UniProtKB/Swiss-Prot annotation:
GO terms under biological process: L-methionine salvage from methylthioadenosine; pentose catabolic process
Protein name in UniProt: Ribose 1,5-bisphosphate isomerase
GO function terms (MF aspect): ribose 1,5-bisphosphate isomerase activity; S-methyl-5-thioribose-1-phosphate isomerase activity
Cysteine pairs bridged by disulfides in the record: none
Pfam families associated with the record: IF-2B
Organism: Haloferax volcanii (strain ATCC 29605 / DSM 3757 / JCM 8879 / NBRC 14742 / NCIMB 2012 / VKM B-1768 / DS2)
Length: 323
């Protein structure tokens, strides 16, 4: 890591990389707070040195999770105004933007939860995959409305994020049935909605989420079970409007099999993709803090929020051409 990056920020980057910090909204919040820390602790001598230091910090954070689009969206928001000519002016801009971003993040999830809860009826059973605070916000809001909700929770290997979801649902008073991932098709007849989160949503309405989401969506469509994706607008991937693709992160082999077992199996090649892509035709609604949208309408929302292009504040500025 760049020596200019504050130790606390390095620690945050490591925790994001190792998934100690997980969940797109949680990652975005941590990234914004890390930039704030860098800004407040910086002893840069002048404005240009301060900007370079913040770019290095943003790069360090950005490189940790290439698929979690909430991370670069958080970096863009916090570093959106770096026009001041003084260190103190720049520092204040970063601090104010980070504080505003984190406050908006908290409000957005509550608003999203209300929108999603309106799709859930009293007595409904949902099926979940992985762990999504946005999806859980929908359930929490429904419970607060007095609705009785039950849940079938996929364990979500290899890291068992479904266990986190099961624990949180239990805390909300929701009866939980925990199932192995491969049993999902069997239990789809018992559920009224599939409710998942998203790490990113592309301009065409495709949903990038934890590996296994697309297979669940295909099975749900076959069974006629509606699929609701809960995703704050910070999960929208503006780069996909201009043809950029979403990188699918490959996780460490050790998450799947330990070295001794691998050797005993004859050292086969092990693939551990963290995410997959669910085509929009398998998604019924994408629920955001700004309302619910059919997947084909997401590009309109993206244009409203981001315009036609995006900046990358972690990139070094291009050298000026000689006159």
């Amino acid at each position: 890591m760049d020596d200019r990056v504050h130790p606390e920020v390095r620690r945050t980057a490591t925790e994001i990389d190792t998934m100690e910090i997980r969940g797109a909204a949680t990652i975005a919040d941590a990234a914004a707070r890390a930039l704030r820390t860098q800004a407040t602790e910086s002893d840069a001598a002048d404005a240009e040195a301060f900007r370079a230091e913040l770019r290095a910090t943003a790069r360090t954070l950005h490189e940790t999770r290439p698929t979690a689009v909430s991370l670069p969206n958080a970096l863009r928001y916090v570093l959106r105004d770096m026009s001041s000519t003084t260190v103190e002016g720049l520092r204040q801009s970063v601090v104010d933007s980070a504080d505003e971003f984190c406050a908006r993040l908290e409000r957005a999830q509550a608003d999203l939860g209300q929108v999603g809860a309106n799709r859930l009826r009293d007595g409904d059973t949902i099926m979940t995959h992985c762990h999504s605070t946005d999806a859980l916000a929908c359930v929490e809001a429904a419970v607060e409305q007095g609705k009785h909700i039950e849940a079938v929770v996929k364990e979500t290997r290899p890291r068992n994020q479904g266990h986190i979801t099961a624990k949180r649902l239990h805390e909300l008073g929701v009866p939980v049935t925990l199932i192995v991932d491969s049993a999902a098709r069997r239990y789809l007849n018992d559920v009224d909605h599939v409710l998942v989160g998203a790490d990113a949503v592309a301009a065409d309405g495709s949903v990038i989420n934890k590996i296994g989401t697309s297979g669940l969506a295909v099975n749900a469509r076959e069974r006629g079970t509606p699929i609701m994706v809960a995703a704050q607008t910070l999960k929208l991937h503006p780069g996909t409007m201009t043809g950029h693709t979403v990188d699918i992160e490959m996780r460490d082999t050790a998450e799947v099999v330990d070295d001794d077992t691998l050797a005993d199996l004859g050292n086969p090649t092990v693939k551990n993709p963290a995410f997959d892509v669910t085509p929009p035709r398998y998604v019924d609604a994408i629920v955001t803090e700004r309302g619910q949208f059919p997947p084909e309408s997401i590009v309109i929302l993206m244009r409203e929020l981001f315009g036609e292009g995006t900046s990358e504040p972690w990139a070094e500025p291009s050298p000026r051409a000689e006159p």
